[in-house]
């Protein structure tokens, strides 16, 4: 599959925020849980809206969402809201469908619950367009010893970590191509866990861009406290 190396085109950040985050055990969707002085999603959106290279931010929310309008970021002129779907891929596709046909934009897809993203990581991912015109993702090399579990919960084997990476977000792809491959993968019934998996299914292999360890996803209650510590540390170094 041929790609023309180009760093042109607008940058559109997409935030799928229609999920409920059941593992947090909270009464509200996890993206609206308080983190320091504001909800998690507000931190995430602020990091994207304040980046000078990002032209537009599209947030996909649930039809039942009664929290989004209370965010100050919801009124930013760079932000557009769309209705998301049941799964992450459905929400990303809804956001991509809000873009004009035949646009040359790049889609920068970022988890709603990753509030510690830095501008430096965004810069590194955007710079990778010349090296990886097919797209790339932020990721981290696996540092720990990895084990594969047997069905009874015991260790089956140790997995070589040499070529393993933790996939992070943002994930950056030409918007039209990502939309095409997401539609095709969903129509084929493929399980899509992130945008890169849809591209891989289509025979497109994204680049890996090393990201920061503090770009964590708030998934469990303990993550909330850790994210707060990371945000405070980042603020002290700015």
Swiss-Prot record:
Transmembrane stretches, start-end: none
The UniProt record lists the keyword Membrane: no
Alphabetical list of NCBIfam families matching this protein: ispD (TIGR00453)
Keywords: Isoprene biosynthesis, Nucleotidyltransferase, Transferase
Pathway assignment: Isoprenoid biosynthesis; isopentenyl diphosphate biosynthesis via DXP pathway; isopentenyl diphosphate from 1-deoxy-D-xylulose 5-phosphate: step 2/6
Protein name per Swiss-Prot or TrEMBL: 2-C-methyl-D-erythritol 4-phosphate cytidylyltransferase
Annotated GO MF terms: 2-C-methyl-D-erythritol 4-phosphate cytidylyltransferase activity
UniProt source species: Shewanella amazonensis (strain ATCC BAA-1098 / SB2B)
Gene: ispD
Residues marked Transition state stabilizer (site): 23, 30
């Amino acid at each position: 599959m041929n790609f023309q190396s180009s760093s042109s085109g607008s940058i559109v950040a997409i935030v799928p925020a229609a999920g409920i985050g059941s593992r947090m055990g909270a009464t509200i969707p996890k993206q609206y849980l308080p983190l320091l002085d504001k909800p998690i999603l507000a931190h995430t959106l602020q990091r994207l809206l304040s980046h000078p290279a990002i032209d537009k931010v599209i947030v996909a929310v649930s039809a039942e969402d009664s929290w989004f309008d209370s965010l100050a970021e919801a009124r930013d002129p760079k932000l557009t809201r769309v209705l998301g779907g049941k799964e992450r891929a459905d929400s990303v596709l809804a956001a991509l469908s809000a873009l004009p046909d035949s646009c040359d934009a790049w889609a920068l897809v970022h988890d709603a619950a990753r509030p510690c993203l830095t501008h430096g990581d965004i810069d590194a991912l955007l710079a990778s367009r010349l090296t990886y015109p097919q797209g790339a993702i932020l990721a981290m090399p696996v540092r720990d010893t990895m084990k594969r579990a047997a069905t009874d919960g015991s260790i089956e084997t140790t997995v070589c970590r040499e070529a393993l990476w933790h996939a992070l977000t943002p994930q950056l792809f030409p918007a039209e191509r990502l939309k095409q491959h997401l539609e095709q993968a969903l129509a084929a019934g493929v399980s899509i866990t992130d945008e890169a998996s849809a591209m891989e299914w289509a025979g497109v292999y994204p680049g890996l861009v090393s990201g920061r360890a503090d770009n964590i996803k708030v998934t469990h209650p303990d993550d909330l406290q850790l994210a707060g510590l990371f945000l405070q540390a980042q603020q002290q170094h700015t």
